[in-house]
């Protein structure tokens, strides 16, 4: 799974909500915002949390900072607090918080809620990356019918072959060898390294040790161009098993 990047800063909010009254002067507000920016630049997480909490206390309807606070709690894996503040940010019109809470629910393995919010966000912002997360959530729920539908959408624009590989895995698990092979090969054509490992196992499972060995060796060559040591290990182990079985 590709690592998800939560938007921390420089977010253009399409709706910031109505600001409540604050006793803080304009100058004090500007000063606090600069302090927050400096804390981000220095990656001073403790100070950043303190400052944003202070800001939110003064401006409880500022959707941008509500979302920022939620992101901080997400990065701390304090999911209950993150959920609370994302929901407040959403109530006040921050659309990015919808995507962020969808990711939060994915991390919590609450896949139904994750899908719900990703689909809601998709209606507002046409971001193809959402397709991948929706597909992944369905996959984790073992709902292959919907997972395949969304991975097929991703495959149309994705360049690395990840989705094609996932499609191959699902079709193979369903016993559809023809479709599995088709999608593994499509994944390899885009250069996805793990598809080589899956093709190795695919042909080994068919008893075609020569073809399995061919894919294992090709995969090992590919791993020389990557830093994926685990894949290299698995391919070498697979090759060893294949050779011993001959």
Model-derived features with residue positions:
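N-terminal leader/linker segments that initiate helical-solenoid repeat arrays
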Residues: 16-64
